[in-house]
Amino acid sequence: MIKLVNICYDYPDTCGLKDLSLTVNSGDFICLMGPNGSGKSTLLRLLSGLASPTSGAYQFHDQPITTTYLADAQNRQQLHQRIGMVFQNTDVQLFNTSVTEEVAFGPRQLGLSAAMVAQRVADCLQLTDCANLADRVPYQLSGGEKKRVALASVLALNPEILLLDEPLNGLTIAAQQQMLTLLQRLQAAGKTIIMASHNYQQVQAVGERFIIFNSTHQVDADLTRADLDQQPARQAQLMTL
């Protein structure tokens, strides 16, 4: 599905990612773990097409995702439809309009009929436990509600892959559990999920693969949950991120 080979990304004044190679398979639930600034968010931006690698190769379903490819607006739109992203700060992706209009925006851009848009909005609001929020606007929502509405708007495009940047950050324990349960349902429905987190305790029960970054912006390990169960020292290290 996704193949990254020797990916590097440089910001003007620092390294963002260094020599990253990774394969993502359909149906994976991957947690990107590591300290703040280690490259987790940078990787999500690259996967979503919001940035291009400085060097290395990125393929999605055997299609090279290059700077030239992303320069084409239609290519970018197609990639964003198939790989959806929920940002850590959801305020950057929510409009100052009702939740219904927020979720309807994407399907309308796809040219769906009014009836199909209405049905998709209803389905996505129901799936994300947001049906009771349909007439609200962002300033009336809690942090957890904003995250779920942002996820509903992404799901309205029916992506294959969901990217989530620290989706549990700032949420109450109840809202965290609600989000994790929702993500498990989405994986069971066939979605591939890649989420960034610095809190292993929050995600250890749902993640199936754990990509662990170190402070030098490199991948230190790619481990399954079973692998980690056999490495208590590694688990203890992750608990201190």
Curated annotation (Swiss-Prot):
May form an energy-coupling factor (ECF) transporter complex composed of an ATP-binding protein (A component, LarO), a transmembrane protein (T component, LarQ) and a fused possible substrate-capture protein (S component, LarMN) of unknown stoichiometry. It is a peripheral membrane protein. One of its GO terms (biological process) is nickel cation transport. Residues 2-240 form the ABC transporter domain. It is an enzyme of class 7 (translocase). Its main location: membrane. Disruption phenotype: Deletion of both larO and larQ leads to a loss of lactate racemase activity. Addition of Ni(2+) (but not Co(2+)) restores lactate racemase activity in this mutant. Its EC number is 7.2.2.-. Signal peptide: none annotated. One of its GO terms (molecular function) is ATP hydrolysis activity. This is Nickel import ATP-binding protein LarO. GO terms for cellular component: ATP-binding cassette (ABC) transporter complex. Disulfide bonds: none annotated. Probable ATP-binding component of the energy-coupling factor (ECF) transporter complex LarMNQO involved in nickel import. LarO is presumably responsible for energy coupling to the transport system. Pfam families: ABC_tran (PF00005). InterPro entries: AAA+_ATPase, ABC_transporter-like_ATP-bd, ABC_transporter-like_CS, ABC_transpr_CbiO/EcfA_su, ECF_ABC_transporter_ATP-bd, P-loop_NTPase. ATP binds at G34, P35, N36, G37, S38, G39, K40, S41. CDD domains: ABC_cobalt_CbiO_domain1. Keywords: ATP-binding, Cell membrane, Ion transport, Membrane, Nickel, Nickel transport, Nucleotide-binding, Translocase, Transport. Belongs to the ABC transporter superfamily. SUPFAM superfamilies: P-loop containing nucleoside triphosphate hydrolases. It is found in: Cell membrane. Induction: Induced by L-lactate but not by a racemic mixture of DL-lactate. Makes part of the larR(MN)QO operon.
